[in-house]
């Protein structure tokens, strides 16, 4: 191999924040179903702690052996609403606590899958799980939750959209940080290694390793070398850089799967920012030529970035999946925070950006007095974008009690901090209160 390429890879890791964001083991809990919830919870704990017992050790070994930082080790499980439905319990918080206990025993960072799939309607387990979300998330530390409220093939379940607005509001009143651990999806994927939205789909193997990479700093650094060049050159540069980043993800995923004796699933091609300086998706867009993210041209630059990352990634790895795009979480991206504070980026522009990237309105802090119906309407808008464009979209908004526009909230760690953003004060309540199902779009009929 060319020495220059080896040195380039070393520089990517040491100076440009290239890392493996997560090695996530997906574990099926279908064989843990039991009408006795205590037995089910014990089976869940036993299976997770057996299957993933070496996950942290292997992640640390790979980081040491290959010099590639592995930031998070995580587990995702079969949606708990499916597992707990057999129990007839009126409350599923004990299942969340079983997941939390397993995660703490393993020493992992997060466990995802306290989830329900209600895109076309509820079964009883879904209703029970959704009602328990605020309490379950407030009483656990490492559990992440998600609810899928729509899909291109099914339409949007507006009853669920209405309820999730109320859940977000209730959760914020218990502890606003719980909303950082909950995502509301349209077109949720079954092999997502990222949190808080990861769960293990029923079509997946008994256990599988999925990997998420992170390389905004690497892409920005590459673009600094082609200042003033045409957009063709910019796209090609991003594509070649994404190839290298994804190749590393595949290497780590394959090694981890082999050491853990489970199949290798996918590499998620998402560019995931962190609050660290130089690890920002917004700064890539500014390197392309925007004075500040949020101005006119932002959506076009982001569309090109997202597409070029995918093109480079699918050449590098034959198994790609998850969310695969550019994440634009406000609190986790220094450039996004600066743009919001400067007034050049607002929620409406972020919504436009979600049309061309993954995943949606992510880690956005909003005033604590925002009505539940307004939150539901934000969810409905994002779900509509996902449904019509046949892509995954999501909402992870955090109403912060007692705070208003212009103030800041601190989340800590990888979640960073966020300015409170303005939401439209005009009511959407009458529309949300209609309920029902928004039918699937005409182009969903593929058969």
Curated annotation (Swiss-Prot):
Tree of life domain: Bacteria
Pfam families for this protein: DUF711
SUPFAM superfamilies: PFL-like glycyl radical enzymes (SSF51998)
Gene3D superfamilies (UniProt xref): 3.20.70.20
Subunit structure: Homodimer.
Family designation: Belongs to the UPF0210 family.
Protein name as catalogued: UPF0210 protein LSL_0162
Annotated source species: Ligilactobacillus salivarius (strain UCC118)
């Amino acid at each position: 191999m060319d020495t220059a390429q080896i040195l380039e890879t070393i520089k990517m890791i040491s100076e440009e924040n290239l890392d493996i964001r997560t090695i996530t083991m997906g574990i099926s809990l279908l064989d843990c179903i039991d009408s006795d919830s205590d037995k089910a919870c014990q089976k869940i704990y036993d299976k997770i702690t057996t299957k993933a017992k070496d996950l942290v050790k292997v992640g640390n070994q790979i980081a040491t052996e290959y010099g590639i930082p592995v930031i998070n080790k995580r587990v995702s499980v079969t949606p708990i609403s499916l597992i707990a439905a057999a129990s007839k319990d009126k409350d599923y918080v004990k299942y969340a606590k079983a997941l939390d206990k397993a995660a703490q025993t393993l020493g992992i960072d997060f466990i995802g899958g306290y989830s329900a799939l209600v895109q076309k309607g509820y079964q009883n387990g879904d209703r029970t799980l959704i009602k328990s979300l605020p309490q379950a998330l407030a009483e656990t530390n490492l559990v992440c939750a998600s609810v899928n409220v729509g899909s291109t093939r099914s339409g949007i379940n507006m009853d669920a959209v209405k309820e999730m607005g109320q859940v977000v509001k209730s959760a914020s009143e218990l502890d606003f940080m719980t909303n950082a651990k909950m995502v509301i999806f349209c077109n949720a994927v079954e092999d997502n290694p990222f949190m808080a939205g990861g769960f293990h789909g029923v079509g997946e193997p008994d256990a599988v390793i999925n990997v998420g990479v992170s390389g905004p700093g690497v892409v920005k650094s590459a673009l600094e070398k082609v200042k003033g060049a045409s957009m063709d050159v910019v796209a090609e540069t991003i594509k070649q850089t994404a190839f290298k980043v994804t190749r590393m993800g595949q290497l780590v995923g394959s090694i981890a799967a082999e050491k853990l004796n489970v199949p290798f699933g996918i590499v998620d091609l998402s560019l995931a920012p962190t609050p660290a300086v130089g690890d920002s998706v917004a700064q890539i867009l500014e390197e392309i030529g925007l004075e500040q993210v949020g101005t006119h041209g932002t959506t076009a630059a982001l569309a090109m970035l997202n597409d070029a990352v995918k093109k480079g990634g699918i050449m590098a790895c034959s198994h790609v999946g998850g969310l695969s795009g550019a994440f634009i979480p406000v609190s986790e991206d220094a450039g996004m925070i600066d743009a919001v504070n400067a007034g050049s980026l607002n929620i409406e522009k972020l919504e436009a950006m979600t049309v061309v990237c993954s995943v949606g309105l992510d880690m956005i802090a909003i005033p604590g007095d925002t009505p539940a119906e307004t939150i539901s309407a934000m969810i409905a808008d994002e779900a509509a974008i996902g449904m019509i464009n046949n892509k995954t979209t999501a909402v992870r908004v955090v109403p912060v009690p007692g705070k208003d526009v212009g103030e800041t909230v601190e989340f800590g760690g990888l979640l960073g901090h966020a300015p409170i953003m303005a939401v439209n004060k005009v009511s959407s309540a009458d529309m949300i209160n209609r309920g029902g199902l928004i039918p699937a779009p005409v182009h969903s009929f593929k058969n």
